[in-house]
UniProtKB/Swiss-Prot annotation:
Interacts with HscA and stimulates its ATPase activity. Interacts with IscU. Residues 2-74 form the J domain. This is Co-chaperone protein HscB. InterPro entries: DnaJ_domain, HscB, HscB_C_sf, HscB_oligo_C, J_dom_sf. The gene is hscB. Pfam families: HSCB_C. PROSITE patterns: DNAJ_2. One of its GO terms (biological process) is protein folding.
């Protein structure tokens, strides 16, 4: 059973996050291992396995990039373990330049420039994220998979910039 079905939700990117949360809480109560403590060993094991599946499904569906990757996996794109990389050389060059810029910001300990950099990367991420949503809505799986690969780069870059921000603010 796929995660969307487990949660009683349609298999699409855009979800009712409140319904997702409520269903998660309901499933947790229903399959919590403590509820099966007096049951047979097989029932206890099944409850533990079901609880683990519910938790994994929850983590996957609530995180936007993980949800997109999972939805794509249902359509034959295993982005989590694939060796396929981004082939857009302009995008890759841009990523290298952004990484170099982040390194320069770190060397200079330039908080103002870092703040501007983070805003710029967030805007790039948001623009590409909106494109991905449209591609998934239109079932343009190949294009969406490529966009998700690019979003991974931007997400890592954003995370690195935010870690640098914390580091600079701690001084």
């Amino acid at each position: 059973m796929d995660y969307f079905t487990l949660f009683g939700l349609p298999a699409r990117y855009q979800l009712d996050t409140q319904a997702l949360s409520l269903r998660f809480q309901d499933l947790q109560r229903q399959y919590h291992p403590d509820k099966f403590a007096s049951g047979s060993l097989a029932e206890q094991l099944a409850a533990v396995q079901q609880s683990a599946t519910i938790n994994q499904a929850w983590q996957t569906l609530r995180h936007p990039l993980m949800r997109a990757e999972y939805l794509l996996s249902l359509h034959g794109f295993d982005l989590a373990s694939e060796q396929h990389t981004v082939r857009d050389t302009a995008f890759l060059m841009e990523q290298l330049e952004l990484r170099e810029e982040l390194d320069e910001i770190e060397q200079a300990k330039d908080e103002a420039r870092l703040e501007s950099f983070i805003k710029r990367v967030k805007k790039m991420f948001d623009t590409r994220h909106q494109l991905m949503v449209e591609q998934l809505d239109n079932e343009a799986w190949d294009a969406a998979a490529d966009t998700v690969r690019k979003l991974r780069f931007l997400d890592k870059l954003r995370s690195s910039a935010e870690q640098l921000e914390e580091k600079l603010l701690d001084f």
